[in-house]
């Protein structure tokens, strides 16, 4: 036989080298949908322990962005890995469908409700718009390879969910946590509605900063508090504020009880007067007022000035000095202008003193008609007029432009105000909600752990939750209030259940269509229907009850995990915690995981104006979803997640390494039937047994990393295994045995068995991350199997067997280190053109006694490990002058070009080539593999 190529076991597979993911993935998605893959997974886990990841609903408005992709991919990785661990892990995606952004979009199309269109018609348009947005986002999420119940997602606008939201509110009421009050809330004058804490963003703004004097009603009496008797000049208390427009609502001056205050006298423009200022701020204040010299007449504690009265600077009444813990000396005068209708601290301290909660400002930010001086003016435009009036009254001591951080509406990006309005609140303290919530935070696992202290601080400091909104498209607060007493109907809880039953059939419009007499009968005239809607954060925050507790696939099991971006500590995590604790006395989750925001390669937020936005649709169309998924998994999500074209291209390079490894495995399993060809691990060649043992240990590490949500560690370990243990060592060594050994011989079948075990394990390792590629690999693996890898559990065939005669893992690591040193010297010889390929080389290893014993243990098989035609081991002391030192102190090397003939079939240079009459171009080993029983390998 002259052409020996046909006697080789050449690799062959249908698995292409190039993934062509952008084109192949959509085809696979079609098959997944056609085969009902998600339901197959569900069926495979019937009766197993549930693991419930509850999807925080994205808002049904606009296209998905890279942050959405990160979130959904992380969730998908967890659900798939938990399924692989044997859990029943359903994934029901959801959408947040009510609220202002949708209203604004619909207004642009059909106008405001009550103008060209009725409120009922407007709600129907909102429902249609939200449904369209859901459909668009759903397709994009599916394209990412995220498996879930996409045909039956939960929508907060589902009639059943709307009804359950109402039911959850009834439980909050039943527990005594709801109250109505006039309180200052974040108010957007553009929205015409209250805002939740989560709807407020802080941006820099320039405001007028003014110092204002409030003259004492009885200056002599006030001076006496400082130990000054018979004082004849005017005494004033000075406040500093950046919101002059709130001065019409001023009802007090707040001081710190333990702070020292000074009475400071000076003369300016021929007038002698005395000011009360915090002692530590006297110098900075008087510098602002251009006072060159002064006298401190006396000092006293703030507590001594309690209830002393001062004239309002332009209104005809006096205001008291009161004491509050919120007063600091960080800026200003140490005395705080207090308007209970326009500030949370002001409101709280005002309640202690029974102050009027004055609110002269309407919904649109314009002063009401009965506001003296400023009626009909918008508050921000009125600032200059307030300053002018103060100057006219002689009360203005200083006025400058001041740049500071100020709350803005997250939708309109415009400054908001604090404004007292009648609203519905969930009380933080009336029935111990704050205390219980803090206890529940301690019982929850926060990932990363800094999430715990973050949400604790928020709960400790948050005000009562204003849950009412004055909007059209939202779940109604289905309450009846007594027209005279403003009290809730005594049967509110049972009435809400009857309303919920109607909403379940007809949607939220059922509330607005309801005639009160249908439920209240003769009492109807005594009560009015509440027209407010719920804060959308209540909608999403109650889904642990309105969705999870209601859908059968969750089996009534509590939620194990919430996973969202780090902004949700004050958003969904907070609202869910508040509602669940109010309803059930416990948190709705056992674990809360947060991921960072996506930034570009320079650490900047994604912005259309900067032009650094990376759209997930662009990535999937160009590189494929698996590349995006690999980037997400490989990135440490605990901080900001950096993404750019360059970074994604690096992910594509890493992907190619994994794909090439998978291709090598599949190609070399050609013709292998595990049912009859599988060699038991204990009967394998030692190197094969080692790699199976190594894979078994790695699998435990990978499963542990998945369980701890450390996906970047999963990818690191996977890449290390593919690149080092496999790529640079095992796969390189076994090529010779795989290609040249007898096809049915033990040496080759042992190797194929190891490759089979690795492939079976690896396809499962990558399935949660590289879902499309895993499916592609799964379809080409030999042996009978289920239709999809996603219904499987972690591979159980990786037996970690160590025989008494086996070489230790440390031995193989040492051999790997030796091989690396040999490769370096061979590479230099190639560069020097002393040899071509490594099989042209004969290597002499000069080693110390310990290393010599290790190297000679595997005898002639050492050459197969080193990929050389000959390998001799001699004592280190015998090293010749030409021997090259290595990074191993125990090893020196000499590489020479072999003088033996090259075997035509295996390319090894062997002395016997040319001596075998029947096969003059072959070595003895190849003849044995062609005509005999096949070579015997013990070690490698």
UniProtKB/Swiss-Prot annotation:
Self-association state and partner proteins as the record states: Monomer.
Binding site for ATP: 608
Domain of life: Bacteria
Catalytic reaction equation(s): tRNA(Ile) + L-isoleucine + ATP = L-isoleucyl-tRNA(Ile) + AMP + diphosphate
Essential cofactor(s): Zn(2+)
Co-factor binding comment: Binds 1 zinc ion per subunit.
Span(s) of short sequence motif 'KMSKS' region: 605-609
Subcellular location field: Cytoplasm
Primary localization class, coarse: cytoplasm
Coiled-coil ranges from the UniProt annotation: none
GO molecular function, a single term: isoleucine-tRNA ligase activity
Residues bound to Zn(2+): 903, 906, 923, 926
GO terms (BP aspect): isoleucyl-tRNA aminoacylation
Protein's organism: Shewanella putrefaciens (strain CN-32 / ATCC BAA-453)
One GO CC annotation: cytosol
Motif window: 'HIGH' region: 58-68
Protein name (database record): Isoleucine--tRNA ligase
EC number, as in UniProt: 6.1.1.5
Chain's role: Catalyzes the attachment of isoleucine to tRNA(Ile). As IleRS can inadvertently accommodate and process structurally similar amino acids such as valine, to avoid such errors it has two additional distinct tRNA(Ile)-dependent editing activities. One activity is designated as 'pretransfer' editing and involves the hydrolysis of activated Val-AMP. The other activity is designated 'posttransfer' editing and involves deacylation of mischarged Val-tRNA(Ile).
EC top class, as a word: ligase
Pfam families associated with the record: Anticodon_1, tRNA-synt_1, zf-FPG_IleRS
Domain free text: IleRS has two distinct active sites: one for aminoacylation and one for editing. The misactivated valine is translocated from the active site to the editing site, which sterically excludes the correctly activated isoleucine. The single editing site contains two valyl binding pockets, one specific for each substrate (Val-AMP or Val-tRNA(Ile)).
Similarity annotation: Belongs to the class-I aminoacyl-tRNA synthetase family. IleS type 1 subfamily.
PROSITE patterns: AA_TRNA_LIGASE_I
Keyword annotations: Aminoacyl-tRNA synthetase, ATP-binding, Cytoplasm, Ligase, Metal-binding, Nucleotide-binding, Protein biosynthesis, Zinc
Residues that, per the record, bind L-isoleucyl-5'-AMP: 564
InterPro entries on file: aa-tRNA-synth_I_CS, aa-tRNA-synth_Ia, Anticodon_Ile_BEm, Ile-tRNA-ligase, Ile-tRNA-ligase_type1, Ile-tRNA_ligase, M/V/L/I-tRNA-synth_anticd-bd, Rossmann-like_a/b/a_fold
């Amino acid at each position: 036989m002259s052409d020996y190529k046909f006697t080789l076991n050449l690799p062959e597979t249908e698995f292409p080298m190039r993934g062509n993911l952008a084109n192949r993935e959509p085809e696979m998605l079609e098959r997944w949908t056609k085969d009902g893959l998600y339901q197959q997974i569900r069926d495979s886990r019937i009766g197993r322990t549930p693991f419930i990841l509850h999807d925080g609903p994205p808002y049904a408005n606009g296209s998905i962005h890279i942050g959405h992709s990160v979130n959904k991919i992380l969730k998908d990785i967890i659900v798939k890995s938990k399924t692989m661990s044997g859990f029943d892990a359903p994934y029901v995606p959801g959408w947040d469908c009510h609220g202002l952004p949708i209203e604004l979009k619909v207004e642009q199309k059909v106008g405001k409700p009550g103008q060209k269109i009725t409120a009922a018609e407007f709600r129907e348009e909102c429902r249609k718009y939200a449904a369209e947005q859901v459909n668009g986002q759903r397709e994009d999420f599916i394209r990412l390879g995220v498996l879930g119940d996409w045909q039956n997602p939960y929508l907060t606008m589902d009639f059943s969910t709307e009804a359950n939201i109402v039911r959850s509110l009834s439980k909050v009421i039943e527990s005594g946590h709801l109250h109505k009050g006039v309180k200052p809330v974040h108010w957007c004058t553009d929205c015409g509605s209250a805002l939740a804490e989560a709807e407020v963003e802080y941006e820099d703004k320039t405001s007028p900063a003014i110092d204002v004097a409030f003259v004492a009603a009885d200056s002599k009496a006030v001076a006496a508090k400082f130990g000054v008797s018979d004082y004849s000049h005017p005494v004033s208390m000075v406040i500093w504020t950046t919101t002059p427009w709130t001065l019409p609502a001023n009802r007090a001056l707040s001081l710190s009880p333990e702070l020292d205050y000074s009475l400071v006298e000076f003369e300016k423009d021929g007038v002698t007067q005395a000011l009360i200022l915090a002692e530590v701020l006297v110098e900075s204040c008087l510098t602002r007022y251009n006072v060159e010299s002064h006298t401190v007449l006396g000092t006293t504690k703030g507590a001594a000035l309690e209830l002393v009265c001062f004239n309002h600077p332009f209104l005809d009444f006096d205001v008291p000095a009161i004491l509050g813990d919120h007063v600091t000396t960080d800026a200003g005068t140490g005395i705080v202008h207090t308007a209970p209708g326009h500030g949370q601290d002001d409101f709280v301290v005002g309640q202690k003193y029974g102050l009027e909660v004055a609110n002269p400002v309407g919904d649109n930010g314009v002063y009401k008609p009965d506001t003296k001086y400023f009626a009909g003016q918008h508050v921000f435009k009125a600032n200059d007029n307030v300053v002018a009036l103060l100057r006219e009254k002689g009360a203005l001591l200083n006025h400058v432009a001041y740049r500071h951080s100020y709350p803005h509406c997250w939708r309109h990006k415009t400054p908001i105000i604090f404004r007292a309005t009648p609203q519905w609140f969930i009380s933080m303290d009336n029935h111990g909600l704050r205390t219980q919530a803090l206890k529940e935070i301690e019982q929850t696992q926060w990932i990363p752990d800094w999430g715990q202290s973050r949400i604790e601080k928020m709960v400790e400091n948050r005000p009562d939750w204003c849950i009412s909104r004055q909007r059209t498209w939202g779940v109604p607060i289905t309450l009846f209030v007594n027209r005279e007493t403003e009290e809730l109907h005594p049967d509110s809880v049972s009435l809400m259940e009857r309303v919920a039953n109607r909403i379940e059939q007809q949607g939220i419009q059922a509330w607005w269509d309801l005639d009160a007499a249908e439920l209240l009968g003769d009492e109807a005239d005594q009560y009015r229907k509440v027209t407010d809607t719920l804060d959308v954060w209540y909608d999403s925050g109650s889904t642990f009850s309105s969705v999870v507790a209601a859908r059968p696939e969750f089996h009534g099991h509590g939620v194990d995990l919430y996973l969202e971006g780090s902004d949700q500590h004050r958003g969904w995590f907070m609202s869910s915690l508040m509602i669940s604790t109010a309803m059930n006395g416990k948190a709705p989750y056992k674990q809360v995981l947060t991921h960072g925001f996506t930034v570009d390669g320079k650490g900047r937020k994604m912005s259309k104006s900067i032009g650094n936005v990376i759209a997930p649709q662009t990535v999937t169309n160009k590189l494929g979803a698996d590349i995006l998924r690999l980037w997400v998994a490989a990135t440490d999500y605990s901080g900001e997640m950096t993404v750019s074209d360059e970074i994604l291209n690096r992910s594509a390079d890493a992907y190619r390494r994994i794909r090439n490894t998978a291709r090598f495995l599949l190609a070399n399993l050609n013709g292998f039937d595990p049912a009859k060809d599988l060699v038991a691990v204990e009967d394998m060649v030692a190197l094969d047994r080692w790699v199976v043992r190594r894979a078994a240990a790695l699998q435990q590490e990978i499963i542990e990393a998945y369980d701890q949500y450390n996906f970047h560690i999963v990818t690191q370990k996977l890449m290390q295994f593919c690149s080092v243990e496999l790529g640079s060592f095992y796969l390189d060594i076994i090529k010779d045995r795989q290609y040249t050994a007898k096809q049915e011989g033990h040496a080759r079948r042992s190797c194929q068995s190891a490759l089979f075990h690795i492939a079976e394990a690896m396809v499962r390792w990558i399935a949660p991350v590289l879902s499309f590629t895993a499916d592609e690999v799964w379809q080409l693996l030999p042996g009978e199997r289920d239709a999809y890898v996603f219904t499987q559990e972690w591979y159980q065939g990786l037996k970690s067997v160590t025989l008494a005669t086996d070489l230790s893992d440390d031995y193989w690591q040492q051999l790997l280190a030796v091989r690396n040193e040999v490769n370096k010297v061979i590479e230099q010889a190639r560069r020097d053109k002393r040899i071509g390929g490594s099989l042209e080389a004969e290597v002499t290893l000069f080693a110390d006694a310990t290393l010599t014993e290790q190297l000679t243990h595997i005898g002639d098989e050492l050459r197969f490990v080193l990929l050389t035609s000959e390998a001799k081991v001699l004592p280190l002391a015998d090293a010749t002058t030409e021997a090259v030192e290595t990074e191993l102190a125990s090893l020196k090397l000499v590489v020479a070009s072999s003088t033996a003939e090259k075997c035509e079939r295996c390319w090894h240079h062997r002395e016997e080539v040319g001596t075998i009459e029947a096969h003059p171009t072959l070595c003895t080993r190849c003849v044995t593999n062609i005509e005999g029983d096949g070579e015997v390998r013990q070690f490698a």
